[in-house]
């Protein structure tokens, strides 16, 4: 009798797990190849593909929730979202508030330049130049020190599209952003006459963060993500997301 009761409890527990919803946040600031957003809905990109595969492996239903960066803390605390990715503990003033996933992949801060200008290959070449940057972002220590000393001029903008327009008008010498979004941009729009410079300003690892109301144990989420790193799934998703969309 006890064995039957235990079996019934296990079955019920499995059924509840499959019925649970995983609420996956996505930042509109990430852009492609990470997020493809139409009318505030996540239509494609790496983040969507990653969320779908993780939810499938965990046996959870899935809902994507648009989450501006300034809303992450509140959404996590309220359970409005359970997880959001493309983050790094070094960017958070209180990283201990969250559980951080294993590192999923590496990103780099690099420069976008006009093709008709000499490629910037060394940090010293930035002296006296104006760089387009993201409002409120903190960059590598040597770059932040150069900004503070006035050796390099910082021009904050709200998004990459604004920096691209300023580059086209020669109001910037270069724009700073993550490598993959810049590669995606230059591949999709060669007519812009822009390219990614060889100089790497900073390299860092990207993680997911989990809130306290995650519908599965954090160990389960960590295990699935770690398996996807080890079996090459993460790398393949990233590479696929960088490719040009197929014609209908």
Regions found by a protein language model. Give the residues of each.
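N-terminal export leaders
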Residues: 2-7
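Extracytoplasmic small-molecule ligand-binding "clamshell" domains
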Residues: 20-90, 95-96, 156, 221, ...
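Ligand-binding clefts/hinges and TM-proximal coupling segments of bilobed small-molecule sensing domains
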Residues: 61, 138-152, 194, 226-248
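Short helices/loops that flank or line small-molecule/ion binding pockets
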Residues: 65, 70-82, 99, 124-125, ...
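A ligand-binding cleft/hinge motif common to bilobed small-molecule-binding domains
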Residues: 74, 86-96, 145, 173-202
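Flexible hinge/capping segments at coil-to-helix
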Residues: 113-131
């Amino acid at each position: 009798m006890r064995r039957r009761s235990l079996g019934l409890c296990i079955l019920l527990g499995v059924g509840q797990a499959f019925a649970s919803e995983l609420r996956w946040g996505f930042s509109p600031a990430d852009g492609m190849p990470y997020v493809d957003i139409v009318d505030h809905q996540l239509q494609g990109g790496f983040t969507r593909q990653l969320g779908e595969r993780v939810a499938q492996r965990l046996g959870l239903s899935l809902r994507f929730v648009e989450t501006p960066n300034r809303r992450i803390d509140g959404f996590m605390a309220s359970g409005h979202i359970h997880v959001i990715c493309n983050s790094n503990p070094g960017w958070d003033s209180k990283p201990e508030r969250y559980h951080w996933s294993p590192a999923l992949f590496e990103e780099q801060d690099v420069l976008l330049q006009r093709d008709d200008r000499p490629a910037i290959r060394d940090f010293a070449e930035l002296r006296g130049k104006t760089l387009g940057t993201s409002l409120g972002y903190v960059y590598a220590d040597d770059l932040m020190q150069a900004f503070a000393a006035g050796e390099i001029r910082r021009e904050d903008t709200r998004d990459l599209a604004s920096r691209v327009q300023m580059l086209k008008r020669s109001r910037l010498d270069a724009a700073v952003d993550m490598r993959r979004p810049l590669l995606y941009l230059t591949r999709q729009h060669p007519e812009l006459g822009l390219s990614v410079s060889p100089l790497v300003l900073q390299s860092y690892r990207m993680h997911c963060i989990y809130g306290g109301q995650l519908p599965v144990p954090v160990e389960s989420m960590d295990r699935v993500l770690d398996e996807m790193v080890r079996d090459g799934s993460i790398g393949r998703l990233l590479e696929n997301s960088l490719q040009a969309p197929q014609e209908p």
